[in-house]
């Protein structure tokens, strides 16, 4: 969807009507897929032989917040989403105003996404050798290296694509490992507190993704507004250009450092 959106908008006229048409097309496709899922999946309800022990909410919350590894996973998920949102959002500005070709966003994002998807498939083979935490850290170090590569030639499309591929490879272990790490935190929580709460741990950890996505989107908007960004202008001020480059180059590094620190705490 992300890769196809801008080319579709351009194809339909690159105006408000084009955005509406693109959104409607995606909505219709989503509706069709949901209907296929609804009419072709049969729910099988398994009645358990014995009713599970009901845990009071207070006791469950106390056990949750005493689980330090759940808190680390909450942070990992949140900052992972923040890094992804910042990289994806600011890249549209970068392609439009720095590379002077908004359509390049689809190429750069596709390069990162394809690399990420390929590596995610082989991560399970690497986990037994390196471990989830170490593999995640190694990948994030590669993300930092990818940003440094991009800094060597900020206006080169080739370098931007190479950097995107490296960044996709680097971030893949985090996306693949964070959910098993949350499951591990549930096992640790049961060992520590004798309270089994898989559902609450995963649900509460997902809050990190919601907060991360919201804060990062709002943060980019505030930063761009603070330097006088105006989307109606064909040419932006020098301050706006500096802000775009600053966020695009250093934003992922900032979040990568935080993620590495969290991984070091996950022992």
List PLM regions with ranges.
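Juxtamembrane helix-start elements in MFS-like secondary transporters
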Residues: 19, 101-109, 241
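Intracellular loop-helix junctions on the cytosolic face of multi-pass helical membrane proteins
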Residues: 1-92, 96-101, 247, 252-267
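Structural signature of the two symmetry-related core transmembrane helices
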Residues: 134-149
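Helix-to-loop junctions at the C-terminal end of transmembrane segments
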Residues: 9, 118-132
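Transmembrane alpha-helix termini and helix-breaking/packing motifs in multi-pass membrane transporters
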Residues: 2-17, 214-241
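Residue-level signature of mid-helix packing/kink "hotspots" within the transmembrane helices
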Residues: 113-121, 214
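A late C-terminal transmembrane helix in Major Facilitator Superfamily
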Residues: 195-227
């Amino acid at each position: 969807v992300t890769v196809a959106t801008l080319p579709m908008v351009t194809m339909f006229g690159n105006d408000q009507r084009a955005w509406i048409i693109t959104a409607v097309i995606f909505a219709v496709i989503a509706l069709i897929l949901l209907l296929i899922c609804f009419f072709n999946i049969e729910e099988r309800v398994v009645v358990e032989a014995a009713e599970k022990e009901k845990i009071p909410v207070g006791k469950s919350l106390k056990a949750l917040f005493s689980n330090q590894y759940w808190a680390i996973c909450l942070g990992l998920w949140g900052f992972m989403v923040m890094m992804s949102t910042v990289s994806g959002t600011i890249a549209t500005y970068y392609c439009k105003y720095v590379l002077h070709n908004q359509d390049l966003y689809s190429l750069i994002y596709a390069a990162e996404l394809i690399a990420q998807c390929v590596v995610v498939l082989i991560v399970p083979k690497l986990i037994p050798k390196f471990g989830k935490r170490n593999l995640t850290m190694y990948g994030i170090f590669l993300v930092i290296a990818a940003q440094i590569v991009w800094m060597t030639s900020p206006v080169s499309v080739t370098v931007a694509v190479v950097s995107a591929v490296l960044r996709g490879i680097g971030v893949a272990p985090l996306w693949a490992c964070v959910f098993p790490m949350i499951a591990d935190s549930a096992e640790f929580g049961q060992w520590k507190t004798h309270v089994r709460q898989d559902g609450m741990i995963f649900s509460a950890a997902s809050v990190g993704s919601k907060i991360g996505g919201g804060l990062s989107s709002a943060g980019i908007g505030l930063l761009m507004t603070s330097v006088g960004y105006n989307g109606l202008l064909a040419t932006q001020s020098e301050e706006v250009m500096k802000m775009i480059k600053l966020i695009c180059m250093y934003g992922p590094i900032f979040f990568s450092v935080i993620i590495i620190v969290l991984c070091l705490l996950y022992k």
